[in-house]
Structure formats: structure tokens, C-alpha cells
Amino acid sequence: MSNTDAFFSRPLAEVDPDIFGAIEKELGRQRHEIELIASENIVSRAVLEAQGSIMTNKYAEGYPGKRYYGGCQFVDIAEELAIERAKKLFGVNFANVQPNSGSQMNQAVFLALLQPGDTFMGLDLNSGGHLTHGSPVNMSGKWFNVVSYGVREGDNLLDMDEVERKAKETRPKLILAGGTAYSRVWDWKRFREIADEVGAYLMVDMAHIAGLVAGGQHPSPFPHCHVATTTTHKSLRGPRGGMILTNDEDLAKKFNSAVFPGLQGGPLMHVIAAKAVAFGEALQPEFKDYAAQVVKNAKALAETLIEGGLDVVSGGTDNHLMLVDLRKKNATGKRAEAALGRAYITCNKNGIPFDPEKPFVTSGVRLGTPAGTTRGFKEAEFREIGKLIVEVLDGLKVANSDEGNASVEAAVREKVVGLTDRFPMYPYM
């Protein structure tokens, strides 16, 4: 076999056994662990095939029909399909599907609408916001004057009176609504009324809830917002990436220019092809059933945790996620994440509102149901999962050490493997 033949023929296992081995181990982890990280999901075989396709070879700077390279006629088809499907999915007139990530989609909107030093408002990180919503360690907090709003201390719900008061005091150029750890319904209409009163743009980051919006389980930010951004993974169940949506043609032109050439060069055409596939899947009737089940499962999980003696921030959830306050179990988020991980339950430590602990320790964990729902889990399974979580945390409380309770974790791990074996994923692999 010539070198050229080998280049096009040798499989990964032969070319790079180290990477192949890591992928095989990751497949085993995903098959046997319960994934409760709210920002993660499991894509279809079709999405995997599109993302792993030969479209990865193609440079395509520009937009469909207006490229800086030749040979783009077929990647144009993929991007045009992604755009049209995104528009249909969210009922909007314009979509940019090129952002490589959630951070880049938000940066593109800032680049289009703000100048360095301008004021914008965003949800405080400790109340469930995102780094790109004005955190001082992020570009958004370094380049702009950020006015943060938060939740009320009593019920941990958004303090809309505070939003209105701060908006009137500071006259921001943009108000950003949306978050990564807020479990209740957003009042887009009230946000728009406040934005109009002070002459601000309303931007909605619906990265976490876009799948629920598409599936009819959360109110759409349109027609209230000027622009919405969303990642394409999470509850949308697509490849990792971002997009920008609007009904305003003038703003759409600004966003297109901000993405390219403002922030990015050549778009990732294999990822855009996979986005198109995922949007097509989300347009099918069964996706509405999926979104409804995600919410049902989250409610079942939250109720079970509360019955087990845990506090759920704001008292429950209306969407796919919940923040669990661990202080009643004398646990930190760091300890709980590690203990649950040893029991094959994957989650992430997360700050809770007014958290006394440091960001890398935290008093809480964030749990979500999209990935488990994709596997086929329903309320009964999530009630079982809730009981297993309580079992691990009770064992951790008794042990009162970073090492956890080995016997309890081993027993739960065995139950988890039994549960996940009933819901296989990627059987062809």
C-alpha cells in the first residue's frame, strides 16, 4: 500500500491508538454513567455522521452565494438548509448559523451593537448568569460597563423591580436576559417594556432553553427581543456551536458583519452541516414530545430531591434544570460532584444565589434532564435517580470527608450501571 493509499485508508485505531483508546473509554463512560450536566446532551447518529463528514475539508469564508473561495456550491447547500430550518424552528426572518460557540455568538452581538465603554445589563453570575453576561473575568466585563441584576434573596426569583430601577438609573444601551442556572420562566414582555422605556436593545441568550422554546415548553422571546442567541447543543440536541436570530433586517446585516469578518474567518462547515441535521430533527413532531418529557422529568427529579431533604433553589423548576442547595447535607458542591461522579452520576458544582462558598467550592450542584431524556428516561427513572443522589449525599454526610463513602458509592454505582444498561446508546459502535 502506498503512503497515499494508507493516508486515505488506515483507520483511527491503527493510526493513533492513544486517541482511539480515549474515545473508546469516553464511549464507555457515556454509556454507563447518568449524565445530569444541564448543558450537555446526546446527539443522534445522523448528527455525528454530518459532523464527521468530508465537509471538514472545506474553507468557505463569507456567506452562501458570496464566498471568498471557489468550490463552495455544496457547503452552500448545507448552510442554506441550516439557516432556513433555524428560521422555521423559531419563527424568525434571519438567522446566522456560523458562530463557533456560545461565547462567540454573544461577542458578535456586542461587536454589532456596542462600543467599548458602553453600558449593558446582564444577570449576575451568582444568580444564574453566564461569564459572557458581564463577568469581570470575561471580555464582556472588561470591555463594557456592566450593570448586573439578580434574584431576590427570599424566593430566588428574578427581581424585575430591581431590573427596572437599575435600567432607569444607568440607561444601558443593551439589556441581556437569559442565563445558565435559572430554573423559572422568563418574562420577556416585561424585559422589553423596561428596555423600551430606557431606549435599550433587548438581547436574549436562550442557550439553555432553546430546545424548550422550539418544543413549545417555554415562551419564545420573539417578538419581544431585538435579537436572540442560542447554542445549538444543550436542549436543542445538536453539535456544539452557536447562532444568532432576529426579525430586523438592518440588525441582521450588522450581526453578519460582526461574525464575519469581525470575529471569525472560515466557518466550520462540517459543524454547520450537523446543525442543519439537528434543526431538521427538531422540526419533527416527536421533538415536541421530547421537550415536554424533559420538563416532566425535571419536575419529577426536583420533587424527589426535596422529598429526600434537599433544598432546590426557588422551590422547584419550570424548565430542564435545577440548582440544588447542599447545605442541609453539610456538603459542598465540590465534594458532592466528586462523590456523585464516583457513583457514575455526572453533574457540576455550581454556585447558588448569595453563596458563601468560593466559586471552585460552591454550596450547590446544577442538575439537568436533557441527556437522560434523550436516552429514554421518563419520570420513573428520574425519581429513581433522585433517590440515588440522596443516597450518595447522605453517605457523604456520614463520612464527612473528601473521600466520601466508598460502600454507599459502590452500591449506587452498581444500580446506575443496571439502569443505564436498560437504555443503550449507539448500539452500532
Curated annotation (Swiss-Prot):
Q: Which GO terms describe its biological process?
A: glycine biosynthetic process from serine; tetrahydrofolate interconversion
Positions modified as N6-(pyridoxal phosphate)lysine? 234
Question: Where does this protein reside within or beyond the cell?
Answer: Cytoplasm
Which domain of life does the protein's organism represent?
Answer: Bacteria
Q: Which reaction does it catalyse?
A: (6R)-5,10-methylene-5,6,7,8-tetrahydrofolate + glycine + H2O = (6S)-5,6,7,8-tetrahydrofolate + L-serine
State the similarity comment. Answer: Belongs to the SHMT family.
Question: Under what name is this protein listed?
Answer: Serine hydroxymethyltransferase 1
- Source organism (scientific name): Agrobacterium fabrum (strain C58 / ATCC 33970)
Q: Output the lineage of the source organism.
A: Bacteria, Pseudomonadati, Pseudomonadota, Alphaproteobacteria, Hyphomicrobiales
